[in-house]
């Protein structure tokens, strides 16, 4: 099917949601990515967390656009294992253009201006400074961005479509993996022998910044372990979307 270039201003609905064959090996993900890069070319960015879903998307993207632009929001609070994984990904996919996007404030400057442990006292403000504002800067020159959201991850993501109007960033958010289960993600990683964050083998289902990520021993929730001492469930990158 032929789909026009969808933008924030002309978005009406997801044209793929009832049309795309989701029974193929990638549950529609490959076709969505192929359409996205053909349509947006250099006007699309993959904001990559380097979690398990990221490994699937990176592998698929490399088959479509080997020199795709990938942005990692480097908060300066990530685990060393995450940085080690990025190095392994660079070795495996040398053509990918991986950009480490840092916040305007260093941790020291943030501590002086707000609080030395802002992630504890005001995690929403910390996420805004170190993740949301940097992504706003990245997307200021892009029409669309790619995310690894899956519907099964959490109730807040259950209505995610392939193509979404992103109200927070005033852009189009492309989510190729919405129909994938966690088991399918890991089967793909194992079958393709892809690199992944070693913390996943140490009971970390979801990996973010060190102060806000904990190992989990008694939950099947793929988002468990994030902000475990508060009611917070999202960093803020995905909370303003409309189904």
UniProtKB/Swiss-Prot annotation:
Binding site for [4Fe-4S] cluster: 126-127, 209, 212
Pfam family, one: PAPS_reduct
Molecular function terms, GO-annotated: 4 iron, 4 sulfur cluster binding; adenylyl-sulfate reductase (thioredoxin) activity; metal ion binding; phosphoadenylyl-sulfate reductase (thioredoxin) activity
Protein location: Cytoplasm
Main location: cytoplasm
Positions annotated as active site in the UniProt record: 235 (nucleophile)
Gene3D superfamilies reported in the protein's UniProt record: HUPs (3.40.50.620)
SUPFAM superfamilies: Adenine nucleotide alpha hydrolases-like
Cofactors required: [4Fe-4S] cluster
Functional pathway: Sulfur metabolism; hydrogen sulfide biosynthesis; sulfite from sulfate
Enzymatic reactions: [thioredoxin]-disulfide + sulfite + AMP + 2 H(+) = adenosine 5'-phosphosulfate + [thioredoxin]-dithiol
PANTHER family reported in the protein's UniProt record: PHOSPHOADENOSINE PHOSPHOSULFATE REDUCTASE
Entry's family note: Belongs to the PAPS reductase family. CysH subfamily.
Name of protein: Adenosine 5'-phosphosulfate reductase
Organism field: Staphylococcus epidermidis (strain ATCC 12228 / FDA PCI 1200)
Lineage of the species this protein comes from: Bacteria, Bacillati, Bacillota, Bacilli, Bacillales
Gene: cysH
């Amino acid at each position: 099917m032929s789909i026009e270039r969808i933008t924030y201003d002309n978005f009406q609905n997801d044209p793929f949601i009832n049309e795309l064959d989701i029974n193929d090996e990638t549950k529609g993900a490959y076709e969505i990515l192929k359409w996205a890069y053909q349509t947006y070319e250099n006007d699309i960015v993959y904001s990559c967390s380097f979690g398990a879903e990221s490994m699937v998307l990176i592998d698929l993207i490399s088959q479509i656009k080997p020199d795709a632009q990938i942005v990692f929001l480097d908060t300066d609070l990530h685990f060393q294992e995450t940085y080690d994984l990025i190095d392994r990904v660079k070795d495996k996919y040398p053509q990918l253009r991986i950009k480490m996007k840092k916040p305007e404030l260093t941790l020291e400057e943030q501590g002086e201006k707000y609080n030395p442990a802002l992630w504890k006292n005001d995690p929403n403000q910390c996420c805004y400074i170190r993740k949301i504002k940097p992504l706003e800067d990245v997307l200021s020159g892009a029409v669309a961005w790619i995310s690894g959201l899956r519907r099964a991850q959490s109730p807040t993501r259950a209505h995610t479509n392939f193509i979404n109007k992103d109200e927070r960033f005033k852009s189009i958010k492309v989510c190729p993996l919405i129909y994938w289960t966690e088991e399918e993600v890991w089967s793909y990683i194992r079958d393709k022998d892809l690199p992944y964050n070693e913390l996943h083998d140490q009971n970390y289902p979801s990996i973010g910044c060190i102060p806000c990520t904990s190992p989990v021993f008694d939950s099947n929730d793929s988002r468990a372990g994030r902000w475990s001492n508060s009611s917070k469930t999202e960093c803020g990158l995905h909370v303003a979307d409309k189904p």
